[in-house]
Amino acid sequence: MLEPDEVVRPKIDPKETSIILFPGQGTQYVGMASKLMRFPEARRIFDLANEVLGYDLLKLCLEGPVDKLNRTEHAQHAVMVSSLAALEQLKEERPKAIDTCVATAGFSLGEITALVFAGVLPFDKALKLVQIRANAMQVACDRVAGGMAMVLYGPDTEIGAACAKAVQWCVDKGIENPYCGVSNYMFPHCKVVGGNIEAIEFLEKNSKALKIRRIKRLPVSGAFHTPLMEDAIEPFAKALKKIPLQEPIIRVYSNVDGKPYRHVPHILKQLPKQIVRPVKWEQTMHQMYERQQGLDFPRTFECGPGKGLVQILEKVNAKAANTALSIEA
């Protein structure tokens, strides 16, 4: 009689597989995508985007102006399309990385890019969806002045208590229904905090007393992934429901809980929540790279502007980051 471990099974060497990550808003910069223009397919992605959107996105990416590029309704398109264009570079230079990809995830907006890559969303429909998401979020931004800041802190810092003090300060100033809380879980001792602009200013001015080692404001126009974005959920969810989604061909991890989507109804339920819930990126990295001791890690490729996600991976899982590479837009 055969022992269970004697049964012949297919074996895929983890080293021969890949994980592809996509960045989010805040990574945009004037001059982005210039390095990708030598790849015809990358240029074609921009041509398609220009056609769907009705304006010259590539020109905005290459030439700015920066204040226009940083506006939510432009930044989200710029980052998503640049990321998909960077994917074309990866396909050209390392086709095996695409063919052997077993999982994908994207930070905030990047999750929609990941869903396009995984075959869930058609590119043109995703562009329209991002337009609705961005416009709805911009309306929420215009309604309440909000901001976000990256916070580095030590083991003796209580981020929750610091945010509570910021909220109380806003209440004392007469601000209606203020909010301040964690909007992104980045890596150990680093989070992004979002809330009313006055709350962020309070944290900046009182960082020493609150035992915050460093605080850096992010170039975004609102408090994303906080309840201040509540008004953006309904238009986004309504638009998402109208799109005929396909089942993902590889695992796609959700920002909301750091776990893979199970099926299309799960995507329809979770993705709108992402607008008001913290991005659990640190938790996602733990889930994606969890494996038995001694097993090799897959290659990781970050496609899009900047090298931020690979740098985060280095702090969450240094061994997994050893074989990580940024394909920069």
Describe the function of each predicted region.
Residues 75-77, 223, 282:
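Glycine-rich phosphate/pyrophosphate-binding beta-alpha loops
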Residues 25-27, 118-276:
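Alpha/beta catalytic cores of group-transfer enzymes, especially the acyltransferase/condensing modules
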Residues 277-295:
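A short, acidic, amphipathic alpha-helical segment used as a generic capping/interface helix at domain edges
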Residues 266, 270, 279-283, 308, ...:
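Short amphipathic alpha-helical segments
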